Each structure stands twice: as C-alpha cells, then as structure tokens.
Amino acid sequence: MDADRRRLLQLIASSSLVPFLELPDGWADAAHASAQSSATPPDSELIASAAEALSVFDFEPVARAKLPPWHWAWLSTGGDGSETMQANREGFERYQIRARRLVDVSKVDTSVRLFNQSWETPIFLSPVGGHRTYNPDGELATARAAKSKRHLQVLSTVTTTSVEDVNAARGEPVWFQLYQRDEWGQTRQLIKRVESAGCPALVFTVDLLGGRNMEQFNRVSQRNRQQCGACHLNGQPLTDLRNRPMLNALSVSATPQPEIGTPTWDYVKRLKDATGMKLLVKGIVTREDAELAIQNGVDGVYISNHGGRAENSLRPTVQCISEVAAGVAGRAPILVDGGIRRGTDVYKALALGATAVGVGRPYMWGLASFGQPGVEAVLDILRREFQLIMRQSGVTSVRGIGATQIVDRQRS
C-alpha cells in the first residue's frame, strides 16, 4: 500500500461520516484495518515532520522506528501481557456521544479551573519518567511544549531533568508526582525541595506497589540491550536511579524502580501535614477509596492504573470515573488518565465526571519522534479534536459537558 493511500484510509477511518460515504467496495474495511494495524510501516510511509500528523497515532510508528528496541518496549508495554493497558484503550468504546442540534457553537470555551488557576484546556501531561531516554532534550522539550500550548504538566519523581530546570524552561512551576520513600526523611527532603521550587501541587502515587511483572518488556530486553548516549549520564545508565536529578542527593539504590513503600491513609495525612502544597492521590479507582481520600483531607483525586504498567486484570480507568465521582460528590477535582488517544476520549471522560484528563504515551511518541515540535503537535491535535466534538455535540463550554451527553452501550 503506498503512503498516500494509507494516509487516505486512516483519514477515512477517523471520520464520523464513514456510514454516509459511498466508498468503493472494500474501502471501509481497508480503512478500518489500516487504522488498527500495529505493524511498523515502511520508512516511506512514516511522517517526516510533526506537521504531517493527522492523529496522535501517526507518531507511534515513528517513535518505534527511531528508538532502540529496549526503549520502545519500556514505553509501549504494560504489566503481565498488557491486558490492563489494552483495556484502558478499549474501555472508551463502551460509551457513545449524544449530539444536540441547532445550537450556536461559533464560540467554544475549552478552559477549566483547577485550584483557582485557569487552564486553556482540560488536557494535561501525565507524569512519565525518563524523558531523556527518548529525546536528548528530555523534560526540557516537554516543558517548553506544554508552556507554548498552555497545558498543565505533572513531573515524575524519576525525571531525568531537575524540577528547577523544568520550571525554568516552562516559565512557571509544574505539579510534582511523588513516590513514597522507605525513609520519611527522604520524602520530607523531596517535599521541601519541590515546595522551594514553587510547585503548587503534590501528586502522591499509590498505584505502583509490590513490584510489577513486565513480561513483554522483559522478553525484549533479554534479546536486545542496545546502548545509546541518551541513556547515560556521566558514563552511567539513567536506569540507575542514583543518576536521576531528584534522587541523586538521597540514599537510593541502583535498582531500576523507586524504593516504594506500602502507603496507608495515615501516610497521606502525614503528607498533608508536611506541606502547604495541594495534595492529590493518584491511583484511586473505587468509590470507597474516593470517600476515604476526601475524609483524609486530600485536595484532589487522580484516577489511574499507571497506564496498565503495574497492575493486571484491572478495569479501564474510564469505567471507574462515575464510581469515583459518586464518592467525591463534587468536593474535589477529579483527574484521570489511561488510554486517552482522541478528543472524543477527553469528552467522554469529562462527561462521566472528570475535571481534567491526562495523556502519557501519546506525547512521549511525539517527543521520541520530533522532540518539542512533536509534543506540541500531539497537544494541538487532541485539542482540535476536542473542540470539534464539542461543536458536533452542541456544547459550548466544558461546564456544559455532563452525563446527559453520553450513552453507556451496556445499559442502553
């Protein structure tokens, strides 16, 4: 299949007008097959610049082609056989959008407010570690892209660039994602550093416990451990956490995972007492835990299963939103990530009760493909798609997106 025909088929597959188009025999099926194909296309079919992308999926094969197999496997696989990761994506198919007609949608407002700060879009950048593993500019490129497109950004504990440098590149402080350290003194040290850097919010992660079985990644890493300069700092691999800028001043082992303890609600209260930053808990997926989060003084609830990277056989995060929203009952903002690939996904998550919606792998595809322009293009595409579905559904502001805008196919 030549590149032009492939691009045309992908464009057709992404269109809501497919049922109404008089396509030649077999074209609709071919379009669907093209959109679903996970094989890396020939180099002649890869986009050559970020500006050529029609959807965020166009960046995925470019990133795969550019990255060493070991790096790509780490980014693209999930826990066990990646079932939870796949469920995150497929979960959005359960919901369909109800469109209203004859509404003046000449002006659409995509802005949201979080903790008295206004953002131009509810789409934010979820925490992902080790950006320099995928592009030499790493988190600096991501921060500049987030700044230029006015998106909220959450920085990972295992960032390969310090929070101070990221904030300088961005021009304003990011939110900071925190793993529990085994020693409270180390956690306290991290909190003070992040607080001194001006970060307004701390995102405490509780969805990565007891290790993880990265079966597919391990199969690839056994076959290929190709080295590259981007993975090394001062001659040492960045997988050694002692080289990570937010951890190198602490007593950290050389293991490829943070030293994650076993957090409890008492620990959450301890965090709350230790800082003036807003505190969110990342990894909440049930009503019971959402209610406990509010009872323990949490300022925000973050629905996540770590992109399906840590826990297997979990529900897709999109199917947890309504339940968690019932537990929160409007008392705190709700963030969610997992499987977000389209503007319609953002819309559905908001309709179910989310306040803001995070993307992870897509912007990393953009970063690995073209650096800062790639991240910017991913954010632009998602925002345009989100604006489009708002207009198509007759909604003029994010506040107008609610449960009446979607239908649960399993209950209709």
Please tell me what each predicted stretch does:
Residues M1-S16:
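N-terminal secretory signal peptides and thylakoid transit peptides that target proteins
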Residues A35-N116, Q222-P263, R399-I401, V407-S412:
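An N-cap/entry alpha-helix motif that binds or orients negatively charged groups
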Residues P68, L125, A146, F204, ...:
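Conserved, mostly hydrophobic/aromatic
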Residues E120-S156:
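Glycine-rich active-site/cofactor-binding loop and its immediate structural neighborhood
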Residues T157-T160, R181, L280-R287, P333-V346:
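Glycine-rich beta-to-alpha transition loops that act as phosphate-gripper elements at the mouths
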Residues V163-G171, I294:
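Acidic (Asp/Glu)-rich catalytic clusters
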Residues Q189-R315, C320-V336, L352-A354:
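Alpha/beta enzyme core
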Residues T317, E323, A368-F386:
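C-terminal helical cap(s) of enzyme catalytic domains, especially alpha/beta-barrels
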